[in-house]
Amino acid sequence: MAQETNHSQVPMLCSTGCGFYGNPRTNGMCSVCYKEHLQRQNSSNGRISPPAPSVTSLSESLPVQCTDGSVPEAQSALDSTASSVQPSPVSNQSLLSESVASSQVDSTSVDKAIPETEDLQASVSETAQQASEEQSKSLEKPKQKKNRCFMCRKKVGLTGFECRCGNVYCGVHRYSDVHNCSYNYKADAAEKIRKENPVVVGEKIQKI
């Protein structure tokens, strides 16, 4: 009699081959496969599919169907299902920290780019100013030194006499009365005397 009861209590595997133990009341399938079977039937008939089994219902159904030898397998399956359903808080925190760090990096890069742009503009303006100065210097041709007498066109070389009127003369035509110099010596002398001898005017006496 005891052998018959032990033989009747031997559990059978799920008919779908999922690895869990089945139940005669659910057509030899486990509770999960049986619910999926019902959902497929309802979807084929056009009915609204029932909600997916929650983790709590799965945990409630597994200990009833499993024997002592299959407890570790069922527990591992339950843990894997729960870990897949529940979101990881560590991943959320890591994503939040990465977004904050990226925003900080963007702000620092913008702050660094502003002074770099100002320095670049200053260097460009300085370069343009230097180029314009060099161009103006190159356009100014050096004046050729006159080496001939303005009156007789005699070549005087380094022995010529340069007058205040701006021309070069030889030893004969170097005097102002000879070459009819256009420079006004009287006005120059009067201006020099005026600068060297300023007019001194005393203060007026105030009557008491």
From Swiss-Prot:
Zn finger limits (AN1-type): 143-189
Gene3D superfamilies assigned to the protein according to its UniProt record, in alphabetical order: 1.20.5.4770, AN1-like Zinc finger (4.10.1110.10)
Positions with a binding annotation for Zn(2+) 3: C163, C165, H179, C181
Record's keyword terms, sorted: Acetylation, Metal-binding, Phosphoprotein, Zinc, Zinc-finger
GO BP term (any one): protein targeting to peroxisome
InterPro entries according to UniProt: AN1-like_Znf, AN1_A20_ZnFinger, Znf_A20, Znf_AN1
Biased composition (Low complexity): 83-94
Pfam family, one: zf-AN1
SMART domains hit by this protein: ZnF_A20, ZnF_AN1
Any GO molecular function: zinc ion binding
Residues bearing the modification N6-acetyllysine: K204
Binding positions (Zn(2+) 1): C14, C18, C30, C33
Record note on quaternary structure: Interacts with PKN1.
PANTHER family for the chain: AN1-TYPE ZINC FINGER PROTEIN, AN1-TYPE ZINC FINGER PROTEIN 6
Name of the molecule in the record: AN1-type zinc finger protein 6
